[in-house]
Swiss-Prot record:
Disulfide bonds: none annotated. Belongs to the glycosyl hydrolase 7 (cellulase C) family. Its EC number is 3.2.1.91. This is Exoglucanase 1. One of its GO terms (molecular function) is cellulose 1,4-beta-cellobiosidase activity. Residues 1-18 form the signal peptide. The active site is at 232 (nucleophile), 237 (proton donor). InterPro entries: ConA-like_dom_sf, Glyco_hydro_7, Glyco_hydro_7_sf.
Length: 456
């Protein structure tokens, strides 16, 4: 996946991350019920009362005690942010109007994320949310020898969008107390992922002002010198055309800063960095089964479906990541690979080795420890993220089209979906599909076989 400068937000005040706490708007997390399960068959599940919080990147950042922007469009205030330390002390982030400004709503066990939300004075694009355990702490998950299940409706997600559900090794408290971070998880701080994103405006309690370059493609985004790297488990990256699940191991524990092209894996240094940016992905279309997922396919994306992901292993060891689906009461095993030289319908070390060879891809997955390193990270605990985003880097073509765009679509691994190579430009999607929405619901978590009736 290529989550580079992908998250855009435009509000009346100009979105930004800051580490002090403002007082203009109260922060009230939307409630979300989910379940933990025991036994087998999905019949013994108990409700858990949780909530979601909006990532701090989308929030209004202003001077402490005032109403002047610390970040406007895609540039920092020279008055309040002449350097990283000053900016962090001078600027505060505020509470969020979840539905009115950001298009985020919950109802019992369902979370709905709307792509474009237009208010009286503002427009917001996309969102990223985290599941909370308490008002000040993210819910942590250890996925080893467990399964994670949810329902999803992608029927309103066209080419170029990604309704994503994934896990990253963030701090449970959002890094509160690091540097000048006084906001913490309550305000959605501490993000990192395997793309070592440079668009994170505050990292470890310090503003990412040094070397900040406003994006030419994204009117709200930019890139600072520092990247925020950490292991990532993509359970679900999808629209109505294509879907993939992908482990991304990294070196180190939790959020690791990178500050040069090599360690960040930027540009031509993609395979030199501390994280596996490509990951080992399972996309049924890319694996040669073109009628398994999509509108009217075996898994019909015009209708809601249940997604089950199992993490086979013990302790900190991970041996296999399996996938099942349920739709219209029928259980479907994941599609088998139809690529010559690659067998299986799950992610294992042997599958990843064979797939990289068949596709001619560089395997930073193996170089960075593969499933062993991914398992160690998962055992340390991950935060659940649910988001909706458009891709300012490569228009989501890596997920739903032919990529690279100049590749022969008949070459193994090049075709990932049926979207045209000209599709997915964020400005086009924002204009043509402003009502695009993803709904995640009915989250269940427990031992293998506890969340659904698993076939023999």
């Amino acid at each position: 996946m290529y989550r580079t400068l992908a998250f855009a937000s435009l509000s009346l005040y100009g979105a930004a991350r800051a580490q002090q706490v403002g007082t203009s708007t109260a922060e009230n997390h939307p409630k979300l019920t989910w379940q933990t399960c025991t036994g087998t068959g999905g019949t013994n599940c108990s409700n858990k009362s949780g909530s979601v919080v909006l990532d701090s990147n989308w929030r209004w950042a202003h001077n402490v005690g005032g109403y002047t922007n610390c970040y406007t469009g895609n540039s920092w205030s020279t008055q309040y942010c002449p350097d990283g330390d000053s900016c962090t002390k001078n600027c505060a982030i505020d509470g969020a109007d979840y539905s009115g400004t950001y298009g985020i709503t919950t109802s019992n066990n369902a979370l709905s994320l709307k792509f474009v939300t237009k208010g009286s004075f503002s427009s917001n694009i996309g969102s990223r949310t985290y599941l909370m355990e308490t008002d000040t702490k993210y819910q942590m998950f250890n996925l080893i020898n467990k399964e994670f299940t949810f329902d999803v409706d992608v029927s309103k997600l066209p080419c170029g969008l990604n309704g994503a559900l994934y896990f990253v090794e963030m701090a449970a408290d959002g890094g509160i107390g690091k540097g000048n971070n006084k906001a913490g998880a309550k305000y959605g701080t501490g993000y990192c992922d395997s793309q070592c994103p440079h668009d994170i405006k505050f990292i470890n309690g310090k503003a990412n002002v040094e070397g900040w370059n406003p994006s030419d493609a994204d009117p709200n985004g930019g890139a600072g010198k520092i990247g925020a790297c950490c292991p990532e488990m993509d359970i679900w990256e999808a629209n109505s055309i294509s879907t993939a699940y992908t482990p991304h191991p990294c070196r180190g524990v939790g959020l690791q800063e990178c500050s040069d092209a090599a360690s960040c894996g930027d540009g031509s240094n993609r395979y030199d960095g501390q994280c596996d940016k490509d990951g080992c992905d399972f996309n049924s279309y890319r694996m040669g089964v073109k009628d398994f997922y999509g509108p009217g396919a075996t898994l019909d994306t015009t209708k809601k479906m249940t997604v089950i992901t199992q993490f086979l292993g013990s302790g900190s060891s991970l041996s296999e990541i399996k996938r099942f689906y349920v739709q219209n009461g029928k259980v479907y095993k994941n599609s088998q690979s139809a690529v010559a030289g690659v067998t299986g319908n799950s992610i294992t070390e042997s599958f990843c080795t064979a797939q990289k060879k068949a596709f001619g891809d560089t395997s930073s997955f193996a170089a960075l420890g593969g499933l062993n390193e991914m398992g160690a990270s998962l055992a340390r605990g991950h935060v659940l993220i649910m988001s909706l985003w458009g891709d300012h880097a490569v228009n989501m073509l890596w997920l739903d089209s032919t990529y690279p765009t100049d590749a022969d679509p008949s070459k193994p691994g090049a075709a990932r979906g049926t979207c045209p190579t000209t599709s997915g430009k964020p400005e086009d999607v924002e204009k043509n599909s402003p009502d695009a929405t993803v709904v995640f619901s009915n989250i269940k978590f427990g031992p293998i076989g506890s969340t659904f009736a698993q076939p023999a």
